[in-house]
């Protein structure tokens, strides 16, 4: 018991000393705009996002096995995509370039299956119908696919880390604009269970 108490007090002392140093450094060291933006405002700039990912836990949790499974899953899905659409061609070319996957051949299973697996269902299909420019279609569909990074989705996080074309803010603006352009949302009735306080059990 005495041993554990000694370790506890030692850890508390070390923590207090480290906190003191951190406080001193915070007072004497100027904070760069990059650090301030990424820490407090969570800027969506692609460069800052990549820096945060490389320096954070996201990079540490990506093991070679995870990347292998990620590549295998994407390769499997890409093999099923129909290459008839120019928008799908552009989108697939970006994914292949991003992950270094070589895809040969195709079937008519198409992009909808890939979209369903990533959880965006019919949104990308509706976007493709409304947007005529193939390049914009590719960007919008890609944005819908990698958007789940906001829910800390592992696959979406890795895609976002490697994707040099779109920022999170651009994805949000494009997806929201396209969803709201022709779809008028009906007001939902009040749901008591949504607003009720949640008690976590430990």
UniProtKB/Swiss-Prot annotation:
Residues 29-58 are annotated as: Disordered. A motif (RxLR-dEER) lies at residues 49-61. Residues 1-16 form the signal peptide. Its main location: secreted. Residues 37-48 have a biased composition (Basic and acidic residues). Disulfide bonds: none annotated. It comes from the Eukaryota. It is found in: Secreted; Host nucleus. GO terms for cellular component: extracellular region; host cell nucleus. Keywords: Host nucleus, Secreted, Signal, Virulence. Belongs to the RxLR effector family. Secreted effector that completely suppresses the host cell death induced by cell death-inducing proteins. The RxLR-dEER motif acts to carry the protein into the host cell cytoplasm through binding to cell surface phosphatidylinositol-3-phosphate. This is Secreted RxLR effector protein 93. It comes from Plasmopara viticola.
